[in-house]
Each structure stands twice: as structure tokens, then as C-alpha cells.
């Protein structure tokens, strides 16, 4: 029940913007993630952009039933970067892949940027320095990508079991 309430209120918690490649030769989400991990892009993010979606879900639950990655979900902390210049998402997207442009209605997304408006992001840093969005953000990304079976599997992992 709490999950349904959260999904119904999602626009109040975060905003999303999709990007697509109209060149006819889109890069694989894995390639885009590798580019994001390069030092110059990581520094541009000022620790305010984390990986979510299928990549994030797999970070938290390696056994999740996923075949491939349909897109790269990024989560930007709108309250991060105090003392730093604000992150220009369009600049970051252009550096990831110059062919990525804001998607029009009905176009598939190669990258989706979700902007968090809450006070704390709860990002987790992996051993390689990659920031991952928290489990709830990854769950919302799976739902938004219409990966319902995987979202339910991930939700089950997140739901504490009561001892009977």
C-alpha cells in the first residue's frame, strides 16, 4: 500500500527528463555509464549525480532478474553542490554523448535524469568511486521503465520480513 502511495506522489518528490539519440546509432547504456565514470565527468558532477535504474538495482541486488539495461537512469541531487557551481545537466549529457537530445513525447529514452528535491540524497559510493542512488530511487526507476516484475522483486528485497 505504501508503494502505491509513493508512486502516486512521485512528481512531488522528483522531476524526470529523458534524452534520446536520433542519429540512428545510439550508444549502449553500458558505454554511457563507462563515460560517466571517467574522471573529468565525475568531477563535473560534484558528487551530486548518482546512477539509478537497472544499474543501481543490480548494485544493491546482484541476483535481480535483469537481462541487459534498457537505459541509463541518473539521479541528480538538487540540494547538493553547496559551494560548487550548480550542475548543468545539458552540459553533462552533451559530454556523455553529443548525439543525446531532449526526447519528445513517445520517443524512447537512452538516458533519463531524475532531479531529487528532498533534503538528503542517500547516495552510496561503490569501491570504484561510482555513486549509486538509494534503493527507493532505483525501485522508482524500475517502475518508470515498466520493468514491473523486476520492481516487485526488488521491492520484496527492500521489504523487511516480520518474524512469525
In which residue ranges do the predicted regions lie?
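C-terminal regulatory/effector modules of DNA-binding transcriptional regulators
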Residues: 79-164
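Short gly/ser-rich loop at a beta-strand->alpha-helix junction or flexible surface loop bordering the NTP-binding
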Residues: 3-115
Amino acid at each position: 500500500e505504501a508503494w502505491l502511495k509513493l508512486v502516486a506522489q512521485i512528481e512531488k518528490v522528483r522531476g524526470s527528463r529523458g534524452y534520446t539519440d536520433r542519429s540512428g546509432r545510439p550508444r549502449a547504456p553500458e558505454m554511457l555509464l563507462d563515460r560517466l565514470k571517467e574522471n573529468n565527468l565525475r568531477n563535473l558532477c560534484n558528487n551530486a549525480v548518482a546512477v539509478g535504474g537497472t544499474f543501481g538495482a543490480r548494485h544493491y541486488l546482484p541476483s535481480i532478474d535483469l537481462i541487459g539495461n534498457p537505459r541509463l537512469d541518473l539521479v541528480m541531487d538538487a540540494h547538493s553542490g553547496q559551494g560548487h557551481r550548480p550542475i548543468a545537466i545539458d552540459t553533462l549529457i552533451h559530454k556523455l554523448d553529443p548525439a543525446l537530445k531532449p526526447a519528445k513525447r513517445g520517443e524512447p529514452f537512452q538516458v533519463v535524469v531524475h532531479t531529487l528535491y528532498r533534503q538528503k540524497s542517500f547516495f552510496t559510493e561503490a569501491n570504484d568511486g561510482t555513486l549509486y542512488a538509494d534503493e527507493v530511487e532505483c525501485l522508482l526507476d524500475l517502475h518508470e521503465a515498466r520493468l514491473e516484475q523486476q520492481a516487485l522483486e526488488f521491492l520484496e528485497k527492500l521489504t523487511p520480513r516480520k518474524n512469525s
